[in-house]
From Swiss-Prot:
The gene is rpsE. InterPro entries: Ribosomal_Su5_D2-typ_SF (IPR020568), Ribosomal_uS5 (IPR000851), Ribosomal_uS5_bac-type (IPR005712), Ribosomal_uS5_C (IPR005324), Ribosomal_uS5_N (IPR013810), Ribosomal_uS5_N_CS (IPR018192), Ribsml_uS5_D2-typ_fold_subgr (IPR014721). This is Small ribosomal subunit protein uS5. GO terms for molecular function: rRNA binding; structural constituent of ribosome. Belongs to the universal ribosomal protein uS5 family. With S4 and S12 plays an important role in translational accuracy.
Length: 179
């Protein structure tokens, strides 16, 4: 019972499903100040992830004087910039390395029932895209924006064996292990 409650509260923490079936996740909110003649002016930035849980995902970064407006802007931007990712029954096709700036990510497929073993910003992207089982590690910078970009870059660069076979003009069976 207690385990169920903790699981429920952890899932609810930064996730929201809307009418159109999209999964929205708030990754980070940051307060930025600008010093002017009359004092400090505060603005807020929001980093959000939007996905359909079936291979489509996008991220947005919004800025505004108030937090809700910044979140709304970033959600709209994320919906405009959706990318499609090829998945293999809820996991990845092959191990992937990608980086953006000093943030590097390493993701590898996991067997069914493993779950999403990833931290912070990477977890939000992987859950929104619909990955159920994956082992992931962030290396280098832990800047949320760069981690999100690196994770998306890795997922977009991943190719299914069928796609590789088509590109090379070969049969998929030629890529099986042990041949």
């Amino acid at each position: 019972m207690a385990e169920e409650r903790s699981q429920r509260s952890r899932d609810r923490s930064r996730e929201e499903k809307i009418d159109d079936g999209m999964i929205e996740k708030l990754v980070a909110v940051n307060r930025v100040s600008k010093t002017v003649k009359g004092g400090r002016q505060f603005t807020f930035t929001a980093l959000t992830i939007v996905g359909n849980g079936e291979g489509s995902v996008g991220f947005g970064y919004g800025k505004a004087r108030e937090v809700p407006v910044a979140i709304q802007k970033s959600m709209e931007y994320a919906r405009k910039r959706m990318a499609n990712v090829s998945l293999n029954n809820g996991t990845l096709w092959h191990p992937v390395k990608a980086n953006h700036g000093a943030a590097s990510v390493f993701m590898k497929p996991a067997s069914e029932g493993t779950g999403v073993i990833a931290g912070g910003a990477m977890r939000a992207v992987l859950e929104a895209v619909g990955v159920k089982d994956v082992l992931a590690k962030a290396i280098g910078s832990r800047n949320p924006i760069n981690l999100v970009r690196a994770t998306l870059k890795g997922l977009e660069d991943m190719q299914s064996p069928t796609h590789i076979a088509l590109k090379r003009g070969k049969n998929v069976r030629d890529f099986s292990h042990g041949s």
